[in-house]
Amino acid sequence: MAQTNPKVQTLIDAIPYFKKFYGKTIVIKYGGSAQTSDDLKEKFAQDIVLLTLLGIKPVVVHGGGARITELLNKLEIPSSFVDGYRVTCKESMRVVEMVLSGEINKNIASLLNFHGAKAIGISGKDSGIIKAVPKDGGKFGYTGDITSVNGELINNLIKEGFIPVIAPIANGDEANHPGFNINADVAACEIAMALKAQKVIFLTDTIGVLNKSGELIQTLDKANVEMFKKDGTIAGGMIPKVDSCIEAIHNGVNKAHIIDGRVEHSILLELFTSDGIGTQFIRVDNPNNGIDIEKLLNKQD
């Protein structure tokens, strides 16, 4: 009996996932660390376009921390981080908005459109899509905590066939307020929750969450995350990511994933292969997570 061509078999193997995610919303956090090469940018755009052709509804929330830091350094504006969150002064806020809304956002939307998508680049400030207040009472300057997301407006764009590409900038409550810099991981989480997305996927510059031996942790739940934060396994910039993942899966999002955005077509590998890649976050009490809980718990013992 003739064997099926491997390329054809790959497509056949992916059919259950095409069916599973058809019509579903997937929020993708496109981190600045995954935007490092033109080739990776092209592969990312191809992945997003393919998702739309398969009837999936992608929403892109992007970061740009590396580019922001680069420009702040050139302008000799001091910048610092606490627990993975940027402390944003008023001068920094102008740079943040210029880079995120004026540069990176439009570049991503243009690239997607070049590849045949119908992308629209927007800021969280537009029409008050994202509203925020000062984080920790102003301890982080113009870095904000989100108070609301206008999911209805985003869904209206999706219904019209657009791929929303969202810059994580938020409105304040005061007139002429310069706005708030929102951690892109947090923004992606809040948007995924507002849309009741099937998944939120974080593209990063690491293979996932690592243990102290540098090995990939494939699955995490809330209890694991708290334990690993306490013992220092999860630290620095990974804290907002894992906190966002846990927040999402406990507020209407089925699964969250941290994957390596440096891997070509990493989104497709996560969505359409049996093993996926990176670290997945689950609720152990969620019957829809597709995980053998007994096996998982035994592995954790």
From Swiss-Prot:
GO cellular component, one term: cytoplasm
Main location: cytoplasm
HAMAP family found in the cross-reference section: ArgB
Keyword Transcription in record: no
Location(s), subcellular: Cytoplasm
Residue positions binding substrate: 64-65, 86, 181
Keyword presence, Magnesium: no
Biological role: Catalyzes the ATP-dependent phosphorylation of N-acetyl-L-glutamate.
GO molecular function terms attached to this record: acetylglutamate kinase activity; ATP binding
NCBIfam families membership: argB
Entry similarity comment: Belongs to the acetylglutamate kinase family. ArgB subfamily.
Keywords, ordered alphabetically: Amino-acid biosynthesis, Arginine biosynthesis, ATP-binding, Cytoplasm, Kinase, Nucleotide-binding, Transferase
Pathway recorded for this protein: Amino-acid biosynthesis; L-arginine biosynthesis; N(2)-acetyl-L-ornithine from L-glutamate: step 2/4
Enzyme class: transferase
Entry-linked Pfam families: AA_kinase (PF00696)
Organism: Aliarcobacter butzleri (strain RM4018)
Protein name: Acetylglutamate kinase
GO biological process: arginine biosynthetic process via ornithine; L-arginine biosynthetic process
Site (Transition state stabilizer): residue numbering on this chain: 29, 241
Catalytic reaction equation(s): N-acetyl-L-glutamate + ATP = N-acetyl-L-glutamyl 5-phosphate + ADP
InterPro entries in the record: AceGlu_kinase-like_sf, AcgluKinase_fam, ArgB, Asp/Glu/Uridylate_kinase, NAGK-C
EC number(s) stated in the UniProt entry for this protein: 2.7.2.8
CDD domains given in the database record: AAK_NAGK-C
